């Protein structure tokens, strides 16, 4: 008897690192007439994306509108997000240091597009919100996969651009109360909690003392 490799209730989740849009990528995709073709970008990843129940990606760019720009202040063409969703990415992480690259209006425009993708492709997004109601609905984000309720919490160490005091907001590691509330909700409503933190020291393979402290706090809570 040949037995299946995985039980029927096995959930496969794949996590992908920073999805970005640098200037050279924008130029390469452009046809010179305000149209952009990204169809070759993730073709070699197709097999990995197709056999997962959930594909999680850190969306480290904004959809802030024109002019489209790469590093250090990212704004990608809108159809890049369509392409990503069409490839099979279905959980977009928004809490990272580039989410406010185009200011509050850039965040709002980005999340407006993600809401459209949620309707058209069934994607999820978390880590940033335009108002309290959206924040409360997606923090934690609880997804039912094959009958297993999994909570996702996304936060960042900081942002490169000034955030302001009001909405929109992104989840910060330093905001312990917001994280504690999300963790408590996850504990009561989900069977498994996954915290996705945008942190680390660039070009270093060693974590810092503060990152270790934050990790211990998250594990304890």
Label every PLM stretch briefly.
Residues 1-221:
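Acidic, metal/ion-coordinating pockets
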């Amino acid at each position: 008897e040949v037995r299946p490799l995985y039980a029927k209730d096995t959930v496969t989740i794949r996590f992908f690192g920073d999805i970005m849009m640098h200037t050279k990528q924008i130029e390469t995709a452009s046809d010179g007439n305000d149209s952009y073709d990204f169809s070759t970008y993730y073709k070699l990843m197709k097999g990995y994306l197709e056999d997962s129940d959930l594909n999680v990606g850190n969306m480290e760019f904004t959809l802030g509108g024109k002019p489209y720009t790469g590093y250090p202040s990212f704004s990608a063409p809108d159809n890049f997000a369509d392409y990503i969703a069409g490839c099979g990415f279905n959980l977009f992480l928004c809490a990272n240091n580039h989410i406010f690259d185009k200011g509050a209006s850039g965040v709002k425009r980005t999340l407006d597009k993600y809401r459209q993708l949620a309707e058209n492709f069934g994607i999820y997004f978390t880590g940033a919100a335009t108002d309290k109601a959206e924040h409360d609905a997606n923090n934690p984000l609880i997804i039912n996969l094959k009958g297993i309720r999994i909570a996702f919490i996304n936060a960042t160490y900081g942002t490169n651009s000034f955030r302001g005091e009001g909405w929109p907001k992104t989840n910060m590691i330093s905001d312990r109360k917001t994280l504690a509330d999300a963790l408590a909700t996850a504990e009561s409503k989900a069977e498994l909690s996954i915290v996705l933190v945008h942190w680390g020291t660039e070009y270093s393979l060693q974590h810092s003392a503060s990152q270790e402290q934050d990790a211990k706090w998250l594990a304890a809570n």
